[in-house]
């Protein structure tokens, strides 16, 4: 089976500083794949290279069988590879509806109204605040809005970059329940997280990134079963 996302030998960084050192990673259709690692491991750099925000220095990125290694980020979005960035990045002076509608600017524009309604079904709280400015919402509500905006583009693969960052334990529980629900509906998810325990509970497979290299790839159960791996890379 050809992976939905197939990353091979990816290298990248900033200026003269190499961050990614030959990363191999794949996500199959309908999978949740957890990408774990500490701050500075290279997780966000990998996301940005895959999504075309910071071009890769070397290696390849194939999505749906198409080489997108050097593609413009707009073409990557049109292909259905959508990232919800770390820190939510909502537009604070725009309303909830306006933020959502921007999510379909490049892809699925003709189904904007239907997709707004779909997001409101998933996140009823957003319907209640449809005319509210995003900057006046709580952190949890902004995270709902950021994910909803990503869903507006009808992604084939949704990359969630540190979605639990700054949320209360209760909201983190709600978030991971939502991710599982999206997966049950058939959406492939690349979950980039420092919340190791809950990520491994819902993931089909996991990667551990350290200093820009993959130190582990496999089943969550295998990662948790190895005392050495857990201590060295997860702090468990």
Outline where the language-model segments fall.
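Glycine-rich phosphate-binding loops of nucleotide-dependent enzymes
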Residues: 2-236
